[in-house]
């Protein structure tokens, strides 16, 4: 359970009888936040299992308390505060909760731009909970918060909260360069795992591959879908936890996997990805993976694949090409 959730559980008296919308939930336990309140949960993260899985929430009628766990991205916080202000017709109580060392103090200036009477309500588990009265604002359009980035002769759409929002990250750039310089063979079926803004999906589709993109983020799924459409390309973009929405086998898996799970650094996601990939690859299928070079992926790749090579590297990143026997 997240520390922020544990702090919220201390607020049982304040939650009793309330109609609560949890926005951008970061913990499945938030679905059972209070037995004495009506709790509706929105999440951008597919793995939360929320009632609403979407880039931005719809505020149910009768909601009298908005609970917002602090995102890692201040752009995401700005977007959500503006969005929520545009979704309410009258001032509504809002709680912002986040780690003391995770940017909660820096987030206050964004909170105070939309909220009256900001107060520190509680502090525990290295987290702080602030409250205030969110004022109604202008109705927002998701598209207005999108950023279009140009990569070579293609375009991609990004939204606040999507990995590397508004720019091409160094790892993905190296991965694209490595694939561009390699004979990938006859285009077939490919999975872009953790598709983000869809830069890699667009590149693959432009080179004739039948693309399936997967991401846990609803914002990323929306962005990748729009990126393909913007370039006049076809592909299927899905929400899911790694390979969960995939049926059948493919010729290639391409990924720039995350090594953070919410705020915690982890290699568990990539370890699962490497272990599960052979189940979804045809014989002779290939996994392309880019990662920070200090991360311990070589042994896991060697355990799962018959041939592993470093296709490209810099002082910070390494691109692996792993072939299934």
From Swiss-Prot:
CC per GO annotation: cytoplasm
EC annotation from Swiss-Prot or TrEMBL: 2.1.1.172
Enzyme class: transferase
Gene3D superfamilies linked: Vaccinia Virus protein VP39
Keywords, in A-Z order: Cytoplasm, Methyltransferase, rRNA processing, S-adenosyl-L-methionine, Transferase
Protein's UniProt keywords contain Phosphoprotein: no
InterPro entries xref list: DNA_methylase_N6_adenine_CS, Mtase_sm_N, rRNA_ssu_MeTfrase_C, RsmC/RlmG, SAM-dependent_MTases_sf, Small_mtfrase_dom
The keyword Iron-sulfur appears for this protein: no
GO molecular function, one term: nucleic acid binding
Domain of life: Bacteria
UniProt catalytic activity: guanosine(1207) in 16S rRNA + S-adenosyl-L-methionine = N(2)-methylguanosine(1207) in 16S rRNA + S-adenosyl-L-homocysteine + H(+)
Main location: cytoplasm
Pfam families in the record: MTS, MTS_N
Subcellular location: Cytoplasm
Family recorded in the similarity comment: Belongs to the methyltransferase superfamily. RsmC family.
PANTHER family linked: RIBOSOMAL RNA SMALL SUBUNIT METHYLTRANSFERASE C
Biological role: Specifically methylates the guanine in position 1207 of 16S rRNA in the 30S particle.
Record's subunit section: Monomer.
Protein name (record): Ribosomal RNA small subunit methyltransferase C
Source species: Alcanivorax borkumensis (strain ATCC 700651 / DSM 11573 / NCIMB 13689 / SK2)
């Amino acid at each position: 359970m997240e520390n922020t959730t544990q702090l919220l559980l201390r607020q049982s008296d304040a939650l009793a009888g309330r109609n609560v919308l949890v926005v951008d939930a970061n913990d499945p336990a938030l679905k059972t936040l209070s037995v004495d309140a009506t709790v509706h949960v929105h999440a951008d993260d597919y793995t939360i299992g929320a009632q609403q899985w979407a880039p931005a929430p719809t505020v149910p009628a009768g909601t009298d308390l908005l609970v917002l766990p602090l995102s890692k991205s201040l752009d995401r916080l700005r977007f959500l505060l503006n969005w929520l202000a545009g979704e309410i017709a009258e001032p509504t109580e809002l709680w912002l909760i986040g780690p003391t060392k995770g940017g909660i103090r820096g987030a206050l200036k964004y909170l105070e731009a939309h909220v009256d009477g900001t107060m520190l309500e509680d502090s525990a588990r290295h987290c702080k909970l602030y409250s205030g009265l969110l004022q109604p604002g202008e109705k927002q359009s998701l598209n207005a918060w999108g950023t279009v980035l140009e990569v070579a002769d293609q375009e991609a759409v990004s939204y606040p909260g999507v990995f590397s929002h508004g720019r091409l990250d160094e790892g993905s750039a190296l991965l694209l360069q490595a694939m561009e310089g390699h004979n990938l063979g006859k285009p077939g079926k490919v999975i872009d795992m953790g598709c983000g803004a869809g830069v890699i999906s667009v590149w693959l589709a432009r080179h004739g591959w039948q693309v399936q993109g997967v991401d846990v983020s609803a914002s990323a799924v929306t962005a990748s879908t729009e990126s393909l459409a913007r370039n006049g390309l076809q592909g299927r973009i899905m929400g899911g936890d790694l390979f969960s929405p995939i049926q059948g086998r493919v010729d290639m898996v391409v990924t720039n996997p995350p090594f953070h799970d919410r705020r915690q650094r982890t290699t568990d996601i990539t370890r699962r990805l490497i272990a599960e990939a052979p189940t979804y690859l045809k014989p002779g299928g290939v996994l392309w993976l880019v990662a920070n070079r200090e991360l311990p992926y070589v042994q896991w790749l060697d355990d799962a694949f018959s041939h592993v090579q470093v296709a490209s590297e810099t002082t910070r990143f390494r691109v692996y090409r792993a072939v299934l026997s």
